């Protein structure tokens, strides 16, 4: 019996050390969650949590980069769970499940500092509906941190000012595309669109990017350039450089065109031509792994 419990404890330790290749895989909200965790400064989205009677919102970042908070009853008692947190494990999907489970079982006024999952959390799919999508509300400041009518202490006001000063203008783009794309202007004379586009076959997706690039169509119109890809949370996110003076809403048509071209090429299993191979090497040389 002793040996069995030792083996079980060891197996549990091993499981905790393993990294989930796609922490949000299997969820319709996968791309939105990844984008909010990695690319979007200030945003939140309502998330229905099974068996929870509170309004729950998943957010990019909360005051102090804390994991979760439940507002006092006098301010509505809504709960917020942060994705960009100070304290976490290498498995963001389990961390989110841990924080959502905490929200479910705690009272208004409570705050969770660390989101680090400890193995006590249920599976994410047991807490949220896998087919639910997120309606992401992007903000250009963090004023939503403060509930209406709440007292703002000088300390809170100062931290809010600092947070607001750090916000990069961002907007969601691409109404009808696969995944989630966000435009951002970080300054330096260039704006970007980062497009989290889930695909189950990584090499087929990279080949599709190469084929579309070889045709000269991997761009979002005049004055734009394909910059490379980010790898994060088991997904590939193409990035485009843009003119910051051009309105973010003007890329809809081009995003839809590129999305359609990629979708058609993903199922193309013919050998790559010499030019397509060259494009593939170029794409691979411009990839940055975030986590």
Set out the residue ranges of the language-model regions.
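Conserved small/polar residues in nucleotide/adenosyl-binding loops
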Residues: 1
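Arg/Lys-rich, low-complexity, intrinsically disordered N-terminal tails that contact nucleic acids
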Residues: 4
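Short Lys/Arg-enriched alpha/beta "domain-start" segment
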Residues: 13-71, 132-160
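Internal, hydrophobic cores of structured domains that mediate oligomerization or house catalytic pockets
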Residues: 73-189
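Intrinsically disordered, Ser/Thr/Pro-rich regulatory regions of eukaryotic transcription factors
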Residues: 180-182, 193, 228
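Short beta-strand-to-loop capping motifs
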Residues: 195-200, 240-244
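Short, internal acidic amphipathic alpha-helical interface segments
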Residues: 199-231
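Alpha-helical oligomerization segments
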Residues: 223-291
């Amino acid at each position: 019996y002793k040996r069995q419990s030792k083996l079980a404890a060891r197996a549990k330790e091993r499981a905790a050390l393993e990294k989930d290749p796609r922490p949000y895989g299997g969820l319709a909200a996968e791309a939105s969650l990844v984008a909010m965790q990695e690319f979007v400064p200030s945003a939140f989205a309502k998330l229905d949590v099974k068996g929870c009677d509170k309004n729950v919102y998943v957010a990019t970042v909360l005051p102090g980069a804390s994991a979760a908070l439940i507002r006092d009853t006098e301010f509505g008692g809504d709960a917020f769970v942060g994705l960009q947190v100070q304290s976490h494990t290498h498995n963001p999907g389990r961390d989110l499940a841990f924080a959502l489970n905490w929200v479910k079982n705690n009272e208004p006024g409570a705050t969770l500092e660390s989101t680090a999952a400890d193995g006590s959390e249920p599976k994410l799919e047991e807490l949220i509906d896998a087919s639910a999508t997120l309606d992401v509300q992007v903000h250009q400041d963090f004023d939503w941190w403060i509930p209406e009518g709440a007292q703002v202490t000088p300390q809170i006001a100062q931290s809010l000012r600092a947070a607001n000063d750090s916000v990069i203008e961002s907007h969601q783009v691409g109404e009808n595309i696969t995944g989630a794309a966000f435009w951002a202007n970080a300054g330096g004379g260039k704006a970007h669109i980062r497009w989290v586009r889930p695909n189950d076959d990584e090499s087929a997706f990279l080949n599709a990017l190469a084929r579309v690039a070889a045709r000269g169509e991997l761009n979002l119109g005049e004055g734009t350039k394909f910059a490379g890809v980010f790898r994060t949370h088991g997904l590939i996110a193409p990035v485009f450089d843009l003119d910051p003076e051009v309105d973010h809403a003007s890329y809809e048509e081009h995003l839809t065109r590129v999305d359609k071209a990629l979708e058609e090429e993903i199922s193309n299993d013919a050998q790559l031509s010499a030019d397509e191979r060259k494009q593939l090497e170029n794409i691979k040389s411009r990839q940055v792994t975030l986590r």
